[in-house]
């Protein structure tokens, strides 16, 4: 219990530092919690961390740093009033013999996150990314999982690597040969008309042509179930070459036939919710397709506790201490 409480204290401390306009990273190692301050707080915490440790970041913008340890990095949430940002490009390169899993939650990464090396099972939950790439053609990362994430630029799926997307928004998915992609309940967009790179397995997904073009269908090596196309030409069938495509209608739908407000232009306030007609299009599980169906409906709220209110008195008590009152918001089920 002591270990759990110490970890929670670290999370809460970091989550509230924005009220003091400070950048704080708390590093939890066993029963010990160490704090680092300033724009390089993340860099310094990562340097001091051991595999299996947890780093909690306050709101604000932190300089990026390369990560080569199976640690957990948490932020204040991507849709909180003051999110956590990691700025500049950085590498994820975990030694393949590291027994711990790398995890990231509740953080906005404003530049490019790059995979390097040979490792498995990194997990990204409730994060927002600009671009995701690979270091070179030798990269082999298996079971890269993104859940409840937004990728507003390009996800470049590296050859010899495997990706799992669960209830995510992806602006551009570029898949190299031999990369394996499985997407469930996702909204997937291309800025152009070419969906030839979308070879993988897709369930309950919505494919959107941003510019309304449609000249190349999905490759016949792909599989799609209970997916729809939006904003393609009326005569174009995105799924025409697929041999496995149950419940994937040939006719494209308009934005207004599916979404409440989305019209192809990304913004941080866009929630990608479906209107009543869109909700009537059911997935393989009998629930709505898109971000809010499936086993893990989209929700950007962090899964760990954060401070929701803090009252600091104007003066100390008769013992010379501050009677600070703290309200904690727990994640909803």
Identify the meaning behind each predicted range.
Residues 115, 135-138, 145-270:
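Predominantly extracellular beta-rich ligand-binding scaffolds that present long acidic/polar faces
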Residues 244-302:
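C-terminal accessory segments
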Residues 60-61, 77-81, 229-235, 280-287:
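Acidic glycine-/aspartate-rich tracts in secreted/extracellular proteins
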Residues 1-23:
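Bacterial Sec-dependent N-terminal signal peptides
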Residues 287-322, 329-331:
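Short, compositionally biased P/S/T/A/G/V-rich stretches that sit at domain boundaries
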Residues 52-54, 59, 64, 70-72, ...:
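Detector for repetitive beta-architecture
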Residues 70-117, 131-132:
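Right-handed parallel beta-helix/beta-spiral solenoid domain characteristic of secreted/periplasmic
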């Amino acid at each position: 219990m002591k270990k759990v409480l110490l970890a929670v204290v670290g999370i809460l401390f970091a989550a509230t530092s924005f009220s003091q306009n400070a950048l704080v990273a708390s590093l939890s190692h066993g029963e010990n919690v160490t704090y680092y301050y300033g724009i390089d707080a993340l860099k310094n915490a990562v340097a001091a961390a051991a595999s299996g440790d947890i780093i909690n970041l306050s709101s604000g913008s932190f300089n990026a740093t390369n990560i080569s340890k199976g640690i957990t990095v948490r932020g204040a949430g991507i849709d909180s009033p003051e999110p956590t940002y990691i700025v500049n490009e950085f590498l994820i390169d975990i030694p393949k013999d590291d027994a711990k899993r790398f995890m990231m939650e509740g953080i906005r990464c404003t530049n490019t996150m790059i995979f390097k090396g040979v490792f498995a099972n990194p997990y990204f939950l409730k994060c927002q990314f600009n671009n995701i790439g690979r270091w070179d053609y030798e990269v082999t990362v298996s079971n890269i999982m993104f859940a409840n994430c937004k990728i507003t630029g390009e996800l470049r799926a590296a050859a010899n690597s495997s990706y799992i997307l669960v209830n995510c928004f992806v602006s551009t998915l570029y898949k190299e040969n031999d990369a394996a992609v499985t997407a469930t309940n996702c909204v997937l967009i291309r800025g152009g008309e070419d969906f030839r790179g979308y070879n993988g397995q897709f369930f309950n997904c919505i494919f959107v042509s941003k510019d309304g073009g449609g000249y190349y269908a999905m490759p016949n090596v792909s599989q799609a179930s209970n997916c729809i196309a939006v904003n393609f030409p009326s005569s174009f069938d995105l799924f025409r070459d697929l041999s496995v495509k149950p419940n994937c209608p040939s006719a494209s739908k308009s934005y207004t036939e599916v979404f409440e407000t989305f019209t192809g232009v990304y913004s941080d306030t866009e929630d990608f919710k479906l209107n009543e007609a869109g909700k009537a299009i059911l997935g393989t599980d009998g629930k709505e397709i898109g971000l809010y169906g499936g086993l893990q409906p989209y929700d950007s709220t962090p899964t760990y506790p954060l401070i929701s209110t803090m009252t600091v008195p104007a003066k100390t008590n008769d013992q010379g201490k501050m009677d600070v009152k703290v309200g904690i918001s727990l994640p909803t089920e």
